[in-house]
Amino acid sequence: MKKWTKKLLEESGYEIKNAQIESVRLTMADHGVLTSDLVLNGHGWGVCYGGYVLGKGYLGSKDFEGYGSGMEAIMRIMDTVGVEEYGQMKGKYVRIATKGLGSSVRIIGNILDDKWFDYESFFADKKDEENDNGM
């Protein structure tokens, strides 16, 4: 996973904004896949952070499949936010890195520490590891 710092993000054209986590959701509703979503509220804007597939299954399914990388992603997000329990993220403040209106938010940061989690590079690295291991 790319090791971001605030300085590197800004040098790469990202704008850093503060946001509050309004809600947290771990759901398999509507998609047949498990996703983790954080609804973020900034000053005059909002965004849902997440949407990556962490497992497959739906209510009443006979087969469920969870991904280790999905669990690791959730744990890394919790570590970045600074909580030990998933539900404790609600109400916490974070920073996001954005390239502006219409761009996806894939990088979230701790409100005080220079600690960041990048969904896109995390899952790209996991995919590369699987390919290297012949999976």
Spans of features found by a protein language model:
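Short beta-rich binding modules
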Residues: 1-135
